Each structure stands twice: as structure tokens, then as C-alpha cells.
């Protein structure tokens, strides 16, 4: 009958390592054990190679932590990537907006420059001499219409009495310029001036020209010899011009154009070229 030890040994015989058996095969086993990397113990083969694949065909490998901490870490990484994408999108949006702004600004500057060039061209045209003269004529004609210069005279009126002299001045429109020549028949300069005034009366029909003999006007003998020819200019019953002995300015030999220039220079009449 087998003993308890035999039973135990018999049941574990497959896993039992005999020391004597290892000693008998020591010389042979030394070479085999080094070559195969395996050791045998009473029929039990133990593979000591750490890289060997288990019999079931599976091999244990390390894996990412999928616990709560791993989930939090993954979520944080996701939010980080999402924030980076937002930053990149914002940078691209700002770059595009800047580009569009530059383009829009350039277009606006071009339009402003073009508008300024057009204004400069118009200003140059307005400042041209021809335009200014035309504008001055139109403005002068408008002013003459507004001040009652629509009245037409066209010739020199002969005043034969002191009363006519007063009526000529006091009964005229306040906007009308009245030029009265005080003359003496025997003076050649007075005769020349009368002819010049006849011509100017035709050229300036809105101005009232008149003449009166110095004796009729009540002038003294001394004035008749030293002050003639003389011009008195009235407007709104007030004297605005008093010119005596015109030969001092015009000389003894003068023409209608000389008288015209003299009156224009002193502001008595306005050059007809401005409103004709």
C-alpha cells in the first residue's frame, strides 16, 4: 500500500524535481540549458525567456490609464486643442479684417484724391481771368438792376436855370449817379469836354449827364477864369465828386477815353466792359 508520501509524490510526480537526476546529467545539461534558455524539472518545462509569447498567444502590454484621472486629462487636452484652434481662427480673422481694412482705406483714399483733383481743376477754371471777368460783368449787371440803373438817359441834358439844376439833383433816383459839367462858352477846354461827355452819355446810358453855364449856375468871375472846366458829381443829393480845372489832369488836348479813364480811376463810374 502506498504511503501518504508516495501518494503525494505520485500526484506531483510531474512537478517533482530530482536533485540526483540533475547531478547525473550535469555535464550534458550544462550545454543544453545555455542553448535553449529553458530548464527542465522532472518533465516540467519552464521558459525563462522574458520575450517569449505565452502559450495562449497573448502578451501583456502597458496601456493608457482609462480611469477618472485619465478621463480628466483627456478632457483637459481636448479643451487645450479647442482653445488653440479658436486662437488660430481669431488670428486668421484679424488678419483678414486688417487686409480688408487696408483695401477699403486705399479705395477711400483714391476716391478722396480723385475728388480733390476735380475740385482743384474746377478752382483753376474759376480762377481763370476769363471766368473772373465774366462773373464780374454778371455781378455788376445784377447790382445795377437792383440799384435802379435800369433807367436810361443816353444824352447830356442842358440845364438853363438854377431851378433846373436843383431839380436835376434833388428829384433823381437816389441810386443814380449825376455828372454835371460847369462850363464857359469861350473856353476851348470846356467845348472839348462837352464833346467828350456827349460820347460818354451814349456809352453809359444809366448815368445822368448834364451841363450848365457857369454864369447860370451863379459862379464868380474868379472861378470862371481859374476853375473851369469843372465837374460836380452827385448821388442821393450828396456831392461825391468835385473836380475843378480838369486840364491840370487831362492836359489841354484830351479825348473821351481820357475822361472815361479819369472818372473810372476816381470811382465815379464803373468800366462799361464789366457789364456790357
UniProtKB/Swiss-Prot annotation:
Enumerate the UniProt keywords alphabetically. Answer: Chaperone, Phosphoprotein
List the molecular function annotations (GO) for this entry.
protein folding chaperone
Gene3D superfamilies per the record? Glutaredoxin (3.40.30.10), Phosducin, domain 2 (1.10.168.10)
Q: Does the keyword Oxidoreductase apply?
A: no
Q: Where is this region: Thioredoxin fold?
A: 153-276
Q: Kindly list the positions at which Phosphoserine occurs in this protein.
A: 18-20, 42
CDD domains membership? Phd_like_Phd
Q: Name one GO cellular component term.
A: cytosol
What GO biological process terms are annotated to this protein in UniProt? chaperone-mediated protein folding; regulation of G protein-coupled receptor signaling pathway
Where is the region Disordered? 18-74
Report the domain of life of the source organism. Answer: Eukaryota
Instruction: Report domain Phosducin positions.
Output: 62-272
Q: What family does the database annotate?
A: Belongs to the phosducin family.
Q: Which PANTHER family match?
A: PHOSDUCIN-LIKE PROTEIN (PTHR46052:SF1)
- What is the role of the protein in this entry? Functions as a co-chaperone for CCT in the assembly of heterotrimeric G protein complexes, facilitates the assembly of both Gbeta-Ggamma and RGS-Gbeta5 heterodimers.
**Assembly:** Forms a complex with the beta and gamma subunits of the GTP-binding proteins. Interacts with the CCT chaperonin complex.
Q: What is this protein called?
A: Phosducin-like protein 1
What is the organism of origin for this protein?
Answer: Drosophila melanogaster
Amino acid at each position: 500500500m502506498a504511503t501518504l508520501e508516495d501518494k503525494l509524490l505520485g500526484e506531483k510526480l510531474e512537478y517533482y524535481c530530482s536533485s540526483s537526476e540533475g547531478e547525473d546529467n550535469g555535464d550534458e545539461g550544462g550545454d543544453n540549458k545555455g542553448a535553449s534558455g529553458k530548464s527542465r524539472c522532472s518533465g516540467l518545462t519552464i521558459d525563462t525567456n522574458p520575450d517569449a509569447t505565452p502559450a495562449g498567444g497573448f502578451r501583456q502590454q502597458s496601456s493608457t490609464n482609462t480611469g477618472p484621472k485619465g478621463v480628466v486629462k483627456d478632457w483637459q487636452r481636448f479643451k487645450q486643442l479647442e482653445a488653440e484652434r479658436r486662437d488660430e481662427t481669431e488670428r486668421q480673422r484679424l488678419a483678414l479684417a486688417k487686409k480688408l481694412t487696408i483695401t477699403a482705406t486705399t479705395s477711400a483714399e483714391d476716391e478722396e484724391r480723385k475728388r480733390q483733383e476735380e475740385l482743384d481743376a474746377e478752382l483753376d477754371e474759376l480762377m481763370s481771368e476769363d471766368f473772373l471777368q465774366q462773373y464780374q460783368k454778371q455781378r455788376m449787371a445784377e447790382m445795377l438792376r437792383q440799384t435802379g440803373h435800369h433807367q436810361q438817359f443816353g444824352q447830356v441834358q442842358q440845364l438853363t436855370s438854377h431851378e433846373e439844376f436843383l431839380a436835376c439833383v434833388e428829384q433823381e433816383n437816389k441810386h443814380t449817379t449825376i455828372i454835371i459839367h460847369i462850363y464857359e462858352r469861350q473856353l476851348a477846354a470846356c467845348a472839348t469836354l462837352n464833346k467828350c461827355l456827349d460820347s460818354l452819355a451814349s456809352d453809359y446810358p444809366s448815368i445822368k449827364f448834364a451841363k450848365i453855364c457857369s454864369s447860370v449856375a451863379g459862379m464868380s468871375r474868379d472861378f470862371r477864369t481859374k476853375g473851369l472846366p469843372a465837374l460836380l458829381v452827385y448821388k442821393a443829393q450828396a456831392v461825391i465828386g468835385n473836380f475843378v480845372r480838369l486840364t491840370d489832369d487831362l492836359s489841354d488836348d484830351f479825348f473821351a477815353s481820357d475822361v472815361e479813364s479819369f472818372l473810372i480811376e476816381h470811382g465815379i463810374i464803373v468800366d462799361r466792359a464789366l457789364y456790357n
